[in-house]
Amino acid sequence: MSETASWQPSAPIANLLKRAAILTEIRRFFADRGVLEVETPTMSQATVTDIHLFPFQTRFVGPGAADGLTLYMMTSPEYHMKRLLAAGSGPIYQMGRSFRNEEAGRHHNPEFTMLEWYRPHYDMYRLMNEVDDLLQQVLDCDSAETLSYQQAFLRHLDIDPLSAEKAQLREAAAKLDLSNIADTEEDRDTLLQLLFTVGVEPHIGRDKPAFVYHFPASQASLAEISTEDHRVAERFEVYFKGIELANGFRELTDSREQGQRFAQDNRKRAERGLPQHPIDNNLLDALQHGMPECSGVALGVDRLVMLALGAESLSEVLAFPVDRA
C-alpha cells in the first residue's frame, strides 16, 4: 500500500465501500433470523474487573456532578445487553464501538467495532453453529473445525492444561524459548495463556476457522461452569489465519456467583498493583431479577472485514486508525 498524507484515510475508499457492504450483510443475517438490533451506552459508571482489560476513563462535570463523576468507556456492550435480556428483550445483537486502552498495531486499535449477540435458550454448541454460519456467509470459507482447549494443548504441546502443575507449564514454555517470561510468572492462567498464544494459536485455523471450547474453569469470566466436567467452563474462542475473531459463553445467570467472581478479580488486581474497578451492581441486580438461560458471543468486526478483504492490517479497513485519528 502506497504512503498517504496523514490527513487522508489509511484505507482505500474501495475497501471502505466493501466494508459498508459487509456491515449491511451482517445486519441482514440477523434480520432474517429475527434478532433485534439494540444500542447501549458507550460510557458507564462501572466497568470490567478482568485483570487483562484496561478501560479508558473520563470525568463528567455537568449538572448533578459538580465534583466530577468518573465514567468508563465500555470495553464491550455485554453488561448493558444482559440488562436488556433480563428485561425481556429476547434475542438481541449490537454492532458498535468498544474501547480498550491497550495496544495498537496490525490487529489492534484502541477504538474498534464489536459485534455482540445473545441467544436465549441456546446452548454453547448451538451458538457456535450460528457463528460458523455467519463466518461462512461473510468470508466464503469452509465450515469450522472444533476442538477442546485440552485437545489443542495435547495436540500441539503434548501437555494436559487441566492437570499440569506450574513446573510442567514452565518446562513447556522453555521448549518455546519463553523461560525469561515463564520462570518469574506465578499465575497459572497467565502461564497457560502464554503457552496458548505462542504454542497453539499459530497452528490452528489455518485453512478454515477453528473453534476452541471448554477453557479451564479458572478462566470462566462470565461463563457457566460445565455440568459435565467442573474443570472447564462453557466458553469458546474462534481463530482464523492467526487471528482471534470471537469469544463466546454460555452465560452465567447466578448473581451471587458473578459477584464473587468480580470480587476475586479485584483481589487479583490489588495483588498486581492495579487499580480496583467499580463493580456493576446494575448487572448483578438484573441477574438477581432473572436473566434467561442464554449464550452470547463478541466478534471483532474490523478483523472480520480484514479477513474478508485479504488485508494484512487493520489500517487497510479502517478510515482513521489511532495514528490518524
Swiss-Prot record:
Species of origin: Serratia proteamaculans (strain 568)
Class of this enzyme: ligase
Signal peptide: none
Cysteines joined through disulfide linkages: none
Family: Belongs to the class-II aminoacyl-tRNA synthetase family. EpmA subfamily.
Protein name as it appears in the record: Elongation factor P--(R)-beta-lysine ligase
GO cellular component terms listed in the entry, alphabetical order: cytosol
Keywords: ATP-binding, Ligase, Nucleotide-binding
Residues binding substrate: S76, P77, E78, Y118, E251
Catalytic function, reaction form: D-beta-lysine + L-lysyl-[protein] + ATP = N(6)-((3R)-3,6-diaminohexanoyl)-L-lysyl-[protein] + AMP + diphosphate + H(+)
NCBIfam families membership: genX (TIGR00462), PRK09350.1 (NF006828)
GO terms under biological process: lysyl-tRNA aminoacylation
Molecular functions (GO terms): acid-ammonia (or amide) ligase activity; ATP binding; lysine-tRNA ligase activity; tRNA binding
EC code(s) of this entry: 6.3.2.-
Binding positions for ATP per the UniProt entry: R100, N101, E102, N109, E244, L245, G300
Domain of life according to the entry: Bacteria
Quaternary structure and partners: Homodimer.
Function: With EpmB is involved in the beta-lysylation step of the post-translational modification of translation elongation factor P (EF-P). Catalyzes the ATP-dependent activation of (R)-beta-lysine produced by EpmB, forming a lysyl-adenylate, from which the beta-lysyl moiety is then transferred to the epsilon-amino group of a conserved specific lysine residue in EF-P.
InterPro entries listed in its UniProt record: Aa-tRNA-synt_II (IPR004364), aa-tRNA-synth_II (IPR006195), aa-tRNA-synth_II/BPL/LPL (IPR045864), EpmA (IPR004525), Lys-tRNA-synth_II_C (IPR018149)
Organismal lineage: Bacteria, Pseudomonadati, Pseudomonadota, Gammaproteobacteria, Enterobacterales
